[in-house]
Structures are given as C-alpha cells and as structure tokens.
C-alpha cells in the first residue's frame, strides 16, 4: 500500500519537532541537525520537515512513497500519462536515505515526488 509523503520547510526545527511530535503523538523516526521525519501508520504518511537555506518555507513538496519497485513502476506510468514533464532522478541519496525517484509538477506548480526507498 502506498504512503502519502509531505515535506514542510520550517523556520525553527526544534519548535516544529515539539509541535509535530505532540500533534502526531510520536517522536520522529529520523532526526538530523536540519531534518526530522515521522513514518506514521495512522494516518499513513511519511511526514518530513527541514530547516535551512535549501528549504522553502511551507509545503516544499508532496509525494507518493511506493512500497515496492513494481508499485513505483505503476506510479511512474501514471506520472507519464499526466501529460506534464517528468524529471527522472533515478537512484539517489536524499533525506538521509537511498531512493529511486521521479518528480513532476501539477499545472499550478505544486511539486510531487514519486519514490521507493530500500
């Protein structure tokens, strides 16, 4: 089953970690000096926050995290069918994980990531 991915750029990482930990009733599963991630089952979401010059404040991007390479292939086929340019990043290391990924923007510029992480 796929998992929704949301990445939010924040101004104060520590303050945001406290807020989202309280909101989700859970501590981050990944915690780095500029990044935190919660892998939640209820709701089924990969929710990440980051701080720094690289991070756009607010919604940085949304994504669909596949749980297998076959599922990623299905999602990728839908990206190609959406009649928008697809950036095929391929195998990469991002957000402290190794992933296979592609990117697309909706007609209003909202960026979506499709990825599978080993």
Residue ranges and their predicted role:
Residues 27-33, 91-93, 116-118:
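Conserved catalytic-core motifs of GNAT/GCN5-like acyltransferases
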Residues 5-7, 37, 61-63, 101-103:
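Short aromatic/hydrophobic contact patches that present stacked aromatics
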Residues 32-35, 56, 95-100:
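Short acidic/glycine-enriched loop/turn segments that link adjacent beta-strands
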Residues 2, 7-46:
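Core segments of cupin and vicinal oxygen chelate
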Residues 42-46, 54-57, 67-72:
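Short, charged/polar surface micro-motifs in flexible loops or helix N-caps
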Residues 13, 64-111:
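Vicinal oxygen chelate
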Residues 6, 50, 96-98, 103, ...:
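Short beta->alpha transition motifs characteristic of CBS
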Residues 27, 47-48, 85-89:
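A short linear hydrophobic-aromatic micro-motif
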């Amino acid at each position: 089953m796929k998992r929704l991915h949301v990445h939010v750029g924040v101004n104060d990482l520590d303050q945001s970690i406290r807020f989202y930990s309280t909101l989700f009733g859970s501590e981050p599963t990944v915690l780095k000096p500029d990044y935190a991630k919660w892998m939640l089952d209820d709701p089924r979401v990969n929710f990440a926050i980051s701080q720094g010059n690289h991070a756009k404040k607010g919604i940085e991007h949304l994504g669909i995290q596949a749980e297998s390479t076959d599922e990623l292939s299905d999602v990728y086929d839908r990206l190609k069918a959406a009649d928008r340019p697809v950036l095929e990043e391929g195998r990469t290391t991002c957000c402290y994980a190794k992933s296979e990924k592609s990117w697309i923007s909706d007609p209003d510029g909202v960026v979506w990531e499709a990825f599978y992480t080993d």
